[in-house]
Amino acid sequence: MDMTAAQVHELYKLRVDIFVHEQESPYKEIDDTDIHPGTQHLLAYETEGGVHLIGTARVFGKPDEGQHIGRVCVAKDARGHGIATQLVKKALEVCTERAAGIDPNKGALIELDAQSHLVDWYERFGFVVDGEEFEEAGRPHKHMSMRI
């Protein structure tokens, strides 16, 4: 699905509000991954009082080389309602659909870089930590992966 200019604006505004302002992270939020033809953006909308973006995630990478889930975020006033869970579940569905042609004996690799305080949350989906803690944009992260 191609995004409209308004959707792109909402996407960047939400991510900058969360990752740059709220988390005080000097992260370069606009990157080439967003425009890559293989990147799929997942968008969650609130419809009460008008339609506005409240959550997003992205899936990118090739199924035979490893897919990546990233930039999962939910607006501060929309947290606690399972939106991030729905976004990750949908991202896993997208990864599974993309991996349909992969040898089932090998499985398809899905990766993400979780902020360290969210490791337990991602483990609920089946991800496991597979590396040492590292810093990205001033925050501790751990690389996690799973095979489907």
What residue ranges belong to the model's regions?
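Methionine-biased hydrophobic packing positions in alpha-helices, especially
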Residues: 3, 72, 87-88, 144-146
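Conserved beta-strand in the GNAT
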Residues: 43, 50-61, 65-73
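A conserved beta-turn-beta hairpin within the catalytic core of GNAT-like acetyltransferases
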Residues: 61-70, 79, 106, 137-141
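Conserved acetyl-CoA-binding loop-helix of GNAT-fold acetyltransferases
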Residues: 74, 80-96
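Conserved GNAT acetyl-CoA-binding A-motif
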Residues: 95-115
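Conserved catalytic-core motifs of GNAT/GCN5-like acyltransferases
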Residues: 111-113, 123, 128-143
